[in-house]
Amino acid sequence: MRSYNLIAPAKINLYLEIISDRPDGYHELAMILQSIELADKINVQSLSTDTIRVNCNHPQVPTDRSNLAYRAAALMAAKFPEALAQYGGVEITINKQIPVAAGLAGGSTNAAAVLMGIDLLWNLGLTKPELEELGATLGSDIPFCVAGGTVIATGRGEKLSPLPSLDHIYVLAKYRSLEVSTAWAYKTYRQEFGNTYLKDTENLAARAAAVHSEAIVKAILNKDTGEIAQKLHNDLERVVLPAYPQVLQLRELFATQPGVLGTMMSGSGPTVFALVESEAQAQAVKLQMRAAIPDEDLELFVTRTITHGIQVASSI
C-alpha cells in the first residue's frame, strides 16, 4: 500500500482584527498569520477498501466525522469518486505534537495535510491554489495551513497575500486542561463590540485593503523585529482575557521576563506566545516561566518561524 508522511505546522496570529459580520455567519477579518516549527506528523496510507479510517495518539482527538482530517478525506472522496474507486480509501494516522484546542490551528493543519496527502496518493495533480480552495470549504484556517509562511489573510481568513518570511523565535505557553471555545469568543465579541462593526460594503473592502498599510506590515517588510513586537494585536483578547484569568496571567508574566520583546494571545486562545531575542533567551524565558508557575498542567514550547506550510517528509 502506498503511504505518505507529512509535516503539518502550527500557526500563530501576529495580528487579528474583527471588521464586521458576514452574511454567511462568519466574521470579516484582517489577520497576519505565521507558520511555526511546532508541528504534527500525519501519515496517509491507501486502503484496499473505499473506507476512511483515522487514528490518533491523543485521547482528546476524535477519530470520527467530527475530526476535520476525516472530513477532508470525505471531501476528496466526494469530489473525486473515480480516484477513490481506482486507488481505494485512506487510513490517516495523526501524531499530535500541537496542543489540542489551543488557537494554533492544529485541526486545520491536519486537514490540510490530508488534502495534500490524498492528492499525492491518488495522483490528482492538484495545485496549491486548488487545494486551498478545497480547504476553504471545510475551515477558514485550512488555506493558510496549505500555503504557510507569513501571510496577510482577509475575508474569513481564506484570502491570502504572502509577506516576506521572518526569522523569529517564540516561547509558547498553554494550560493543558484549559480550552477556549472559538465560537464563544467570536459570539461574545459580537455581543460586546458589534456596535463598532463596519456596515457599508465599500468601507469593508477599504478596511480589508488597508491592513496592507498597517504599521506591523511595514515592520515585517523592514524586518524590524522590535517594531513587530510592539505592534502585535488581537481583538479577541478584549473578551478572552477578562473571562480567563489564567490566560491573562501568562500574558502578564511573559511581559515581565527579560528578553521578551512582545507577547500576545494566539487566535481565540488559550495559548499565549512571547517573541524573544534569541534561542538562548527563549530557553531562559521557558525556565523562568516554569519556575514562576510550577504547575504540571502548564505546557511550554520553544519554537521558531518557518517559511512553508504542509511538507512531505517521506513516501513509501
What are these regions (language model features)?
Residues 158-262, 277-283, 287, 297-316:
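Conserved, helical-rich catalytic subdomain that frames metal- and/or nucleotide-binding sites
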Residues 93-122, 140, 259-272, 276:
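Glycine/serine-rich anion-binding loops at beta->alpha junctions
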Residues 33, 135, 254, 289-290:
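Hydrophobic C-terminal alpha-helix "anchor/cap" residues
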Residues 14, 42-44, 69, 107, ...:
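Residue-level signal for inorganic ion chemistry
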Residues 17, 45, 145-147, 151-156, ...:
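Short beta-strand-to-turn element immediately C-terminal to the catalytic PLP-Schiff-base lysine
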Residues 1-102, 120, 124-129, 166, ...:
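ATP-binding N-lobe of GHMP and related small-molecule kinases
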Residues 126-180:
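Alpha/beta catalytic cores of group-transfer enzymes, especially the acyltransferase/condensing modules
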